[in-house]
Amino acid sequence: SETSIIPELEELALKNTSFSNKASGVGGALPATNTGWTVAGMAAQSAGVPLKENLVGGRDHNALGEFKKFLPGAYSLGEILEKQGYNQTFVMGSEASFGGRDKLLTQHGNFNIEDYNYAKKHGKISDDYKVWWGYEDKKLFQFAREEASRLAASDKQFNLQLLTADTHFTDRYLDETCAKTFSNQYDNVHACSSKQVAAFVNWVKSQPFYENTTIIISGDHL
């Protein structure tokens, strides 16, 4: 039988509720048209709408960030939770302004954004630190642990979201701490990401706030 590259993620899918497009329950959702890049996947999953190319006049689909308003009239999960009094933070290891992700998050939910620039400004990384899109997922999960602990210390409910990037095309980023079990970088990066995600989930499950917490794991795009 074939050896799984991501056994930890497969186990999470099979032992929990999985919205897979496969009968086996292993595999992500089936991507719809105009949801196949980062900010489009974020918008589709939070507001249920695709980002049509005509929104940017036929230009590069990430040009939506140049507009003052991001999807005016759309109503997202972030806005629902904001009205319910949730503290909301989004952690990412790249610049939130890319593709207009910052506008999506601030105009549809009033998120506190902790991105690559935030990490530099607050001394989490040095000013000249740059790997891959900004900083690697190993740091992302550590910063997410710190932020989850901070949010949980408040008496308000919270929505913490994080966006991994090591598995992003074209080449993907293989952290030096990741094992090189397989013969190619693609497999090794995904295998490492599977372990990192599972470790973060297990950490959350060990925390006092886990009892009233829902964890959602989703691929933002292919």
Q: For each predicted feature, which ranges?
A:
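Solvent-exposed soluble domains appended to multi-pass membrane proteins
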Residues: 1-222
